[in-house]
Amino acid sequence: SLILFLRLRDIPVNMRAKGSLQSIVPKIRPLFLPLAIALFFRMFLAVSMTTYLPIYMRFNGASLWMAGASLSILEFAGVAGALMSGSLSDRLGRKSILLWITVISSLLMLAFLYSADWMLIPILLILGFTSLSSAPVLLALVQDHFPDNRAVGNGIYLTMSSLLRSLVMLLVGMAGDAIGLQSAFFWSALISLLA
């Protein structure tokens, strides 16, 4: 924050006219209904890998240290993916990047479930890079559709995302209790392909 402040403090601020909220209402359903459906399916992979990964690792015999490190590895790679995916989507298109992210991360999750121990860290790095990189692309997609009301569009998206994440977290947890985390992770990877 300090670096941004120091670099941007001398840039003049141009206030644009605020957009009308009435202009945003007709755009809500055509964008957010399909986005909510895709996000719901996509959340299965994201929730499985971020919320339940350490528990999954412990159930499969990993040490407590390795279980915690696996989440750190995934999240660390996700930061790099998030930083790169926004720029890539500007050049290659939002939908194509989201398609590739979804397919690659789902296949990598399946590979993670059935890989040898020595392959876990490389797979987690690539999986984190791909699976956690969709958020900036989705935010950019929302901003593309609401150029005059970006804050409202982002607020609707983030609220929807938080609510869906909470719901999917419960569903994956209940599935993990009922059929085991291995099966819940497997089905989460397949369900995320529906996005």
Show the residue positions of the predicted features.
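Hydrophobic core of transmembrane alpha-helices in multi-pass small-molecule transporters
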Residues: 40, 119-133
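C-terminal membrane-cytosol helix-exit motif in multi-pass small-molecule transporters
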Residues: 1-16, 195
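Structural signature of the two symmetry-related core transmembrane helices
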Residues: 96-111
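Helix-to-loop junctions at the C-terminal end of transmembrane segments
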Residues: 81-93, 176-177
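A late C-terminal transmembrane helix in Major Facilitator Superfamily
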Residues: 145-181
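Extracytoplasmic gate region of multi-pass secondary transporters
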Residues: 30-82
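Intracellular juxtamembrane helix-capping segments at the cytosolic ends
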Residues: 133-146
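Juxtamembrane intracellular "pre-TM" segments in multi-pass secondary transporters
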Residues: 9-35
